[in-house]
């Protein structure tokens, strides 16, 4: 909902038109099969983009574990439940050039407590989207990737990161002081309501420590 608010504001400010190609704002897509996707295709979820991409896999050190990362059954090597039918191991670590346990130059994106992502990872995200399989355009299929690209477009056109834009233009004016994209920056953890019982993310926070 936050991204859509920002998209509507940018549209009102004439920062784009619905018929603009998303590659007009993300030039890395110009030499791909996504080059002609229109902004309206993304908004309507009719772009043909894949529903989701597990970007985090690019940050995992594949030499830090043996065997498969996932299993369809819980066992000694895969003790953590990932979803209804998938279990994941918890003995892997992240690539130290991509994930840090503290904020430092080049590692400014906080993704969890004591877990920072390298700024260059945005290029990895764009590359993964660029190389992903494109389905049938014009047919409804929900995709998180649509709104990732819309976020990138809005941030570029409005010249602000999404969290600051939404706080300054919407949340603060509404007095919605407990609404934020990065709640760890403004709220105590006891004031943040969990959105899901995600043991995998908890494991990620724990095992990021070897990358210090």
Feature map (PLM): residue ranges:
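Active-site SXXK
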Residues: 1-18, 42, 147-155
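Short, surface-exposed loop or secondary-structure junction motifs
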Residues: 35-204, 208, 212
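General secondary-structure edge motif
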Residues: 2, 22-23, 130-134
